[in-house]
Amino acid sequence: MALFGSSGIRGVIGSGMTPELALKAGKALGLLHKKIVIGHDPRTSSHMIEDAMVAGMLCSGARVTRIGLVSTPTLAYAARNYDCGIMITASHNPPEYNGIKFWNPDGMAFSLKQQDELERLIESDIRGVGWEYIGSESHASNAILDHIDVILRNVEKCSLKVVVDCGCGAATTITPYVLREMGCKVISLNAQPDGFFPARDPEPIDENLSELKEAVKAFDADLGIAHDGDADRMMAVDDQGRLVTGDELLAYFCRFEVKDSVVCPVDASMVVDRCKPGVKVYRTRIGDAFVSEEVRKVNADFGGETSGTWIFPRISYCPDGIYAAAKLVELVSKNGRLSKAIADLPRYPLKRGGMKFSHGNKADIMGGIRAEIEQANSRINTLDGVRVEYPEGWVLIRPSGTEPKIRITAEAVDEGAAEKLYSQAESIVKRCIDSCAQ
């Protein structure tokens, strides 16, 4: 059974994620690395999972440093002084979930090769070292201050009014402090860590951010910032109290922060291709780890996913919602109202949907879709599903990772063209589903 998903090992406490699994993971990791730093988010199960993980690492003779309640980007930045870093978190998932994220010293998540090696060891029978070789444990308290320091060295002072919704997550330890040190007037919401996430669901999407949107208007703030449970994500609300979409925020960063090149996944809007002439756009599979890998490979200025993960390689290859918040505030201070800057971006109608199936499998269906599309089109990207480029727009057809469904996304220069591209893709998907069901 595959343990690793797109963001480490994750599951519901008591079933997909247990202390027993964390103990095995710790023993396996301790065989591969001997100097390890570990931190956690505020979930009710985080101490339990961390303790089990640490016990396993000590059992294999590792030297472990605990840095306590921190954000994921804080942990990933701290990992630069260790063989690797471990974050106990389930990020944007509901409170009953928890997980283990693995980070290299440069802020890159563990590669597929590293994951495979670790998974093989987890599934083996590791006895551990003798009593005289058991590892050691220590505590460090400077990780948050170090992260704050590197952020402040890479942004300029400004005096905006900012509302920050920490969501009762790990951002409570850092984002309000960073923005105040920058010179901002900060109004904090849900700034007490609470693993039950009583104020809102940890995922920073529109329906979960009503309080933030109202607060931005009520306090006449320049913008609002929202994080998920471990603060690797950052989303924003403009000065009118409207959530800035992930595609808009990606394009905003591209327009004002990127000089030469940007990396984004295949499902990102074509606005990123057209918002700043001369910028090279590289597209990857969906998932921040793939974006980070490509940022490093092509030496890009910036990478981002529309879910709210933003990668600034000058700091780290780990998505850093804290630095993203600070950088966004700096850019708004320099370039004027966020609502106007977003309104000035190109706009293209985008339609998302999909078709479920009860017979056949995703691989066969996608194989049929790819074969049919390849017969009629030459501009095809098959990194993640099938993306087809047209003069007026593009279509992406890809399998869902969680349900028997083929997802369809179409974007074009006008509504009619988007509807036409979507309908054409939908017809192809239906034919291939029907064919595989026979």
UniProtKB/Swiss-Prot annotation:
Mg(2+) binds at residues 91, 228, 230, 232. GO terms for biological process: carbohydrate metabolic process. One of its GO terms (molecular function) is magnesium ion binding. Keywords: Isomerase, Magnesium, Metal-binding, Phosphoprotein. Belongs to the phosphohexose mutase family. Catalyzes the conversion of glucosamine-6-phosphate to glucosamine-1-phosphate. Its cofactor is Mg(2+). The lineage of its organism: Archaea, Methanobacteriati, Methanobacteriota, Stenosarchaea group, Methanomicrobia. It comes from Methanocella arvoryzae (strain DSM 22066 / NBRC 105507 / MRE50). It comes from the Archaea. The modification Phosphoserine is found at residue 91. This is Probable phosphoglucosamine mutase. The keyword Phosphoprotein applies. It catalyses: alpha-D-glucosamine 1-phosphate = D-glucosamine 6-phosphate. Its EC number is 5.4.2.10. The active site is at residue 91. It holds the Pfam family PGM_PMM_II.
